[in-house]
Amino acid sequence: MLIFAAPSRTVSVLCRYLSFGPSNMHHRLLSVLAASAVVGVNAATTASPYDYIVVGSGPGGGPLAAELDRAGFSTLLIEAGGDEGDNPTFADIGNFNEAANDEATRWDFWVKHSDDPARDLKFTHNTWDTGDGTFYYPRAAVLGGCGMHNAGVCALPADDDWDIIAKKTGDKSWSADNMRKYLKKIEKNEYLPAGNAAHGYDGWLSTSVANNSWAKNDSLPDTKILQKLAELTGQDPDNAANLVNRDLLESGKKADDTSSFYNMVTHADAKGKRSSPNNYIRATLADPVKYPLTVKLHTLVTRVLFDNTTTLSKPSVAPRAIGVEIMEGASLYRADPKYAPGAKCPISQILANREVIISGGAFNSPQILKLSGIGPAAELTKFSIPVVKDLLGVGENLGDNYEGSILARGSAPVESRLITLLLRTPSAPTRKLNIYAWCGAFSFEGFWPGFPTYYGPTQYSCAMVHMAPKSQAGSVRLASADPQDWPEINFRFFARHGEQDLREIVEAADILREAINAAGPPVAPLEERHPCPGGKAAANCTDAAQAEFFKLQAYSHHAMSTCAIGGDGDRMAVLDSRFRVRGAAEDIIAEAKKLPR
C-alpha cells in the first residue's frame, strides 16, 4: 500500500508500504519522523557538513533523504541495519515470507495484546514468548526498511481519511484533492497505458499487477469462489471476471464505499522485482558528483542533541535540535536476533546545520523521542531522563488493524490464484468499507519466527484485515533508559468498542466461509480448521464462539499513531500538520508515523 504526505517546508514526500494487504490503508503512515534532543552541544562553535540528518531509511526516511539531497541539501541518512539490495531473497517480491524471516534484516519485537497475561497466553503461537510479551512482531532493520521484506501491496487511504487530518489541523494541504499528486510524483506505473490522469509514469516506485485471466474460466474452483463472493457482496457474478481487474489505486468516492473486487497492486516491476526505497537511495548514491548523499549503515541513534542554549533553565526558549548521538556497529539493538548481550561501541556525535528528522517507525520513533527528553514527564523522570518537553502523547494512542483468517483444507489442491476484495459488513457503523480480504492457496495465521505453517497442497485460506478499528488504547513505553533496549509495547486490543469490531469481523468470516464452500468438486468438501473446526454447522460456530476466537487469535503488523498529528487544542498531539514536534523550535521537524487514526 502507498500513503503520501504533503510536503513540509523541506520537500518531503512520504510513503508507506503494507506487508500483506492495505489493512491500514485508512489509517496510517508507518514511518514516524520526529525530532528531539538532549542538552550538551553549543551549535555556535561547531560546524557540520550536513544540512539535514535523517534517521531511518524506510519508506518515510529513505525517499525523504534522497529528495532532500536531490534538492541540493547535503544530507546524512542513518540506518541501523545493512544493505541487502543485491540479495535475491529481497529482490524478488514473491519471496516475502523468506525475506521477513531472514536474520539479515529482522528486528524481533515481543508485544502484548492486553493487560491480562492469562488472555494473551491463549494465543496459539505463544510458545515463542521471551517473557516480555506474548506476541511476536517482526520489523525491518535494513536499507529501505519494511519495503525490503513486505508483500508489497500498494493502496491509498479513503478520501475521508485525508480530509479528517485537514479538518483536525486546519491545514488544507492534507485534503484528498491535494494528496493524489504525490502518488503521481513517485509512481512508475507498469500496468496501465500511459496517460491515465490518476497515475504517474516517471517516478522511482514501480507498480504492477497480476494476470487475472484465470477468472474467465467458469470451471475453476477459484472462479466459483469468486462468483459466490460477488453474489454475497452485491456484485454481479456474471461480471466477476472483469471486476477482478479493477484498479486498487483508482480515485473517486465510489472506491471508498462500494464493495468490490480489485487487482492487487504491488510495488514491483512487471518482472516481479521489488521496487523500494533501497532502489531510490542507490540511484541517488550512484551519482556522487551530482547527489552527494551520505549513508551510514549499522549505526544506532541513541538520542538527539539540543543546542545547550535551549535547556529547561530557559523555558521561554523552544528547544532546538542540532544533531544526534550515535553508536556504530552491527546488531547493537536488542531486537536484532544477532544481538550479543553486553555489546557496546563508542559513542560519537554528528551535527546538522538545519534539521534533524527521525523516521524510526511506530516503536522506535517514540523511544528515541523519550530517550531525548521529549515525552510524558512522569515516565522520563522515572528513568532519570532530563525533561526537555513534556508531551503526553509520545508513545500513546497506539493502534493497529485487527487481522485474522479462515483456514480450510480441501479434498484436492487449488492452484495459487489470488482473489482480492474490499467490503462493508452489514453492521458497519458507516458507509465506508471496513474489511480487506484476500483468498487463495496459502495459510496466514499471524507471526512467529519461521511463519507461516504449511498445511499441505490442499490448504486454502481467506485472510482479512479490519481497516477501521475503533480502539487505539495501546502504548509504547520505555523499559529502561538504555537505547539498546527495546520498549514495552502493549496494543490493548479491543479495549474500546471491541464488541462492535468483533461483530464486524465475524460477519466477514461468515461471508468468506460461505464463498469458500462454493468451490465445488474436486476441492469440495473442505474441512475448516478455524475459526470453526467442522464448519458452520458445528456446535462451536456460534457468533459468540467466533468472536472469542478472533479476540484471542487476532494478530497485526501495521502499528500506528504513537506520535500523532493533531490540532492546537489536542493535548495528546505530538506533531503539527508539518510534522514538527509541538513545542520545539521551528527547525525541529517530524515527518510522520503519525496519522491520528
Where are the regions that the model predicts?
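N-terminal FAD cofactor-binding segment of flavoenzymes
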Residues: 73, 80-141
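Intrinsic disorder/low-complexity signature
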Residues: 14, 21-24, 39, 48, ...
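Structural core of flavin- and non-heme-iron oxidoreductases
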Residues: 21, 26-95, 137, 143, ...
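Classical eukaryotic N-terminal signal peptides for Sec-dependent ER targeting/secretion
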Residues: 1-33
